[in-house]
From Swiss-Prot:
InterPro entries: Nucleotide-bd_a/b_plait_sf, Ribosomal_eS24, Ribosomal_eS24_CS, Ribosomal_uL23/eL15/eS24_sf
Biological process annotations from GO: translation
Annotated disulfide bonds: none
Keywords: Ribonucleoprotein, Ribosomal protein
Family from the record: Belongs to the eukaryotic ribosomal protein eS24 family.
Gene: rps24e
The keyword Cytoplasm appears for this protein: no
Name of the protein this chain belongs to: Small ribosomal subunit protein eS24
Coiled coil: none
PANTHER family: 40S RIBOSOMAL PROTEIN S24 (PTHR10496)
Organism: Thermococcus gammatolerans (strain DSM 15229 / JCM 11827 / EJ3)
GO molecular function: structural constituent of ribosome
Gene Ontology CC entries for this record: ribonucleoprotein complex; ribosome
Ranges that cross the membrane: none
Keyword Heme recorded: no
Length: 98
């Protein structure tokens, strides 16, 4: 799996970086969200606990997937802005048992 960052936007109003990237996974299935998030965080020297992987889109017959991630300056900012289902999906919060 190889990740190529195509664009990084600085969103100062929301206190985050918006990262667009391509994942080249020739001869392999689409990589897991955890694997992509870990490699992207290591590549860009970011904290994976303040990073949300919004989507990975794979296209039929292609060995390239496109993705979008958001890296926040602080965890508090991320928890305030991002919807709960996104945080649950990325494993950044745990669902409360009733």
């Amino acid at each position: 799996m190889e990740i190529k960052v195509t664009e990084i936007r600085e969103n100062k109003l929301l206190g985050r970086k918006e990262i667009y990237f391509d994942i080249i996974h020739e001869g392999e299935p689409t990589p897991s969200r955890e694997a992509v998030k870990g490699k992207l965080a290591a590549m860009l020297d970011l904290d994976p606990n303040t990073m949300v992987l919004q989507y990975i889109r794979s296209y039929f017959g292609s060995h390239v997937s496109k993705g979008y991630a958001k890296a926040y300056e602080t965890r508090e900012r991320m928890l305030y802005i991002e919807p709960e289902y996104i945080l649950l999906r990325d494993g950044l919060i745990q669902k409360e048992e009733e």
